[in-house]
Amino acid sequence: VPIYVSAGFGFTSDPQPPAIPHDNNPVGSYRRTFELPAEWEGQRVFLHFGAVNSAMYVWVNGQKVGYSQDAKLPAEFDVTSHVRPGENTLAVEVYRWSDGSYLEDQDFWRLSGIERDVYLYAVPQVRLRDFYFKQDLSVDFSTADYEVVMDLRNHLGKEERGGAELQLLYGQEVVSSQN
């Protein structure tokens, strides 16, 4: 059992990982409606939670979307197949303790619930999800080689062709360009 602080775990004096107390595990229930813009139809829709402590189940329009646990990291769910234009209902069940609570035994207030922003966002079916830029500078910093790795996502179920252009700027001047 990891022990990070001199204080014991907040939920038991006799820890038995990964067991959590079922008779003393408060649950917070959250429910609200939201409007999905009609112009989001045909796009991927994601539900983002900035942080929820300690574990949660999520439902959209009565359908279970998923589960997440980690007190300080974001969680995202692809809710495209669960939402519709117009009014939708979001329900979240937050558990105070989870088996992850053993790893999160840090010196902080032991409060539970939704701790950061919750929002929806829409993206195209084919998109650049992320990229990584790696550079290798010469010893005198006068030249550099670089590599760009792109994470492309295609949710259409069929092959799509496209292109990307990369421009490296120095002020307003294009010093390198690649297709």
Question: What is the meaning of each model-derived region?
Answer:
Residues A71, D140-A144:
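Ser/Thr- and Asn-enriched, surface-exposed coil loops between beta-strands
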Residues F133-V139:
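Short beta-strand segments of immunoglobulin-like
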Residues T143-N179:
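Beta-strand-rich binding/interaction modules
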Residues I20-D130, N154-L156, Y170-E173:
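Accessory beta-strand-rich segments of carbohydrate-active enzymes
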Residues V1-S6:
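Predominantly extracellular/luminal regions of secreted and cell-surface proteins
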Residues A7-H22:
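Surface-exposed, low-complexity/disordered Ser/Thr/Gly/Pro/Asn-rich loops and linkers
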